[in-house]
């Protein structure tokens, strides 16, 4: 199935971190709020797969590879990101529902990245506020723009005429 999605430039999201659906690759610069898929660096991908956060897929990270991670871009190069026990602030604005957790759903300690940073050129900070237990840049830091692809939900590109629009003629 993954080979078919690569040929068609599709990505299927079944994770609660983003709206469920079928997404396709779009030629767009990585903008704040854009949904992207990314291959995590090998060691981080292996960590995520070993813990069951990600399944098998096309990215490097152990036998059988690791699936791509889908998230929204929260901060771009030059943005100031502050992560504390209370949550994430981007350029001084508190992001609702962004408090990092100490443990995952199985009680295992999560990596902790606290402090203030400025996102460097060529990087983005990924964050999901759709799901409280999302594994994102709060735990592993920014990711390289060169490792991500911007995607868009297929249904966002489909216009469906209401069923009543063709009646009465």
What are these regions (language model features)?
Residues 63-97:
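Mid-length scaffold segments of soluble, non-membrane domains
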Residues 34-36, 79, 123:
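Structural motif
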Residues 74, 89-94, 98, 106-169:
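Beta-strand-rich cores of mature extracytoplasmic or soluble domains
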């Amino acid at each position: 199935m993954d080979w078919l999605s690569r040929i068609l430039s599709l990505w299927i999201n079944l994770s609660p971190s983003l709206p469920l659906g079928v997404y396709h690759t779009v030629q767009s610069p990585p903008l704040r709020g854009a949904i992207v898929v990314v291959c995590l660096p090998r060691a981080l991908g292996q960590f995520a797969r070993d813990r069951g956060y990600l399944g098998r897929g096309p990215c490097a990270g152990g036998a059988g590879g690791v699936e791509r991670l889908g998230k929204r871009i929260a901060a771009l190069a030059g943005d100031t990101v502050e992560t504390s026990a209370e949550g994430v602030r981007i350029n001084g604005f508190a992001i609702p529902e962004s408090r990092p957790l100490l443990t995952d759903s199985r009680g295992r300690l999560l990596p902790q990245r606290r402090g203030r940073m400025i996102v460097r050129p060529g990087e983005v900070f990924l964050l999901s506020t759709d799901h409280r237990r999302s594994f994102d840049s709060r735990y592993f830091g920014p990711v390289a723009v060169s490792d991500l692809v911007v995607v868009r939900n297929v249904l966002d590109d489909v216009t469906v005429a209401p069923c009543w629009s063709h009646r009465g003629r």
